[in-house]
Amino acid sequence: MECFQVFEAGEGIERAILRGLSARGGLRGRCANGGHPALLVVSPRAAARGTRLPRQCRTVLLPGGMGGVPPRAASAVSYGASPRDSLTISSREEGALWAALQRELVTVEGQVVERQEFSLPLAPGEEELPLLACAGALLLLGIPPEELGQALS
């Protein structure tokens, strides 16, 4: 039984999620039941490589336009540059990426996060999509949008 599982190809997403969670005292509450992760996070490179994924989870966070067969999930949240994605890039400025939550989402604990924009710290040379994946995972794990910048810095 796991709260979340990350499928990645060296992007550092799981490490960033764990660092962000530890800054807030770790995970709280029930996360999974039935032996499946409450949250499955798929990185851009893992999706591009066609990484084999578990058959099911409660919520899946995946790159928009991901090919193949996604896991069976009660909820799917996409991230990427397309306006059709749930979590998108709104704009960029020096040292920051503005992300837009295009539709409300429900965290693994059942809290609703409303549509909004928020700033994320973007280090020089850092890739944008893995940063969006980290932000999306932290949102789904209960980190409020206004605390994401601090959790990811």
Which sequence ranges carry the predicted segments?
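Short, solvent-exposed linear motifs at loop/edge-of-secondary-structure regions
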Residues: 72-84
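Adenine nucleotide phosphate-binding catalytic loops in nucleotide-utilizing enzymes
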Residues: 81-153
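Phosphate-binding loop of NTP-binding sites
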Residues: 1-75
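Fold-independent oxyanion-binding glycine-rich loops
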Residues: 9-10, 42-45, 62-65, 79-81, ...
